[in-house]
Amino acid sequence: MKEAKGKTLSKKQYLIVASMIFALFFGAGNLIFPLHLGQLAGRNWGSAAIGFSITGVVLPLLSLLAVAITRSNGVYQIALPVGKIFALSFMTLIQLTMGPLFAAPRNATVSYTVGIAPLLPKQFKSIGLFVFTTIFFAIVFMIAYNESDILSSLGKILNPIFLILLFLVFVMAFAHPLGNLSTVAVSKEYLHGTVVKGFLEGYNTMDALAGLAFGVTVVTAIKELVNNNEKKVAKITAKAGLMAVIGIGIIYTLLIAVGAMSLGHFKITSDGGILLSKIVNYYAGIFGQALLAVLVFLACLTTAVGILSAFALDFSAHYPKFSYKGWLIISCVGSFATANLGLDKIISWSLPVLMFLYPLAIVLIILSLFSPLFKGDKVMYKVTMALTLVPAIFDLITHLPAPIAGTQFYKAVSQFRLQYLPLANIGLSWVVPTILGLVISIFIHVWHRKTNKI
């Protein structure tokens, strides 16, 4: 069958695709991480920005390309060459992470931290969070239950307003800086190895996971534009994606710089949400803070509706005991419960999960990108992923917070990891085993080709 002849996209169509990719990866909930990173890195903000950009900007684009090249319809299909059990487990973990465990409740708590918490006395902040998250997830449920597109339509208006407000904050921050970028203090842990620390901080955006889980929607839209011409899909995804991630990269870099400059006026905050509220209040007063609160609330609401709807759809397909609406109820209740732990606890508990998932996602993305070279040989996937999985499990255990941190089991695992896994001291214990897995699997693949087994 002859492949349909693809159309050449106009500049306007490229911009539309780029804006879709931008919307997929850039969310108000992610603003807090580059700001906090800037405060921690201080005058080393530039090298921190490089590391953050690799995992927060470049990797998400590569995840989209992986979806396009493998012609997958979701994270399950991308992971399938490793095996059915792995694919189902990986899809489940990513959807739980993006859904009720971390990303969805984080969107609610970021919105609360930026908009409501600064207005409440300390003794009312817990009850305030309870009331806010009740309302937040009730709205999420109603919109997702009725499958309304009201928020996506609203997003077309809100996102530009939000970006304009952010642009004005940047203008004010550099015209009237809070501190000197070249002299601000560096926190103790960011004196050395700042690029790697920025790289690991980029895990918090979860954008590479989002690309694997939801990237198919963008790729499908591109296919429709080029009459299903598969050869052009990856090329257009790369071009439009590059436009989008350059924009995201600039915003993240400026936020890191603003976070670093803020040290001239503010102490290091527990999270970037508090800092964002303080900075906007400093430059734009209560009106600016109120506008920011409304925009962040609506932006986070839009994101939460999208990811919990996707969670319910994926789970109803792979776990059909409950319908879409049943899984939606479970995800909203679960997100509400997690959100009431507070933003700091959500971030601290998400870290070990991300330290486990990200190495697997990175390796899966790399293998998917180069799969045409080895004809999708499953041995390449199985061997490499097996050797990545082991250190990823160690990373998960050794990044668990209290009460597990400090136990004898925790100490024994940590000591073993540091003693036997190279680069474990900088959080990259998976790198050497992964390279070893790649080398072994390449030898096996070449041997199979020579003996005509593939």
Ranges and model annotations:
Residues 100, 104, 163-190, 208-209, ...:
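Hydrophobic alpha-helical segments and their helix-loop junctions in multi-pass secondary transporters
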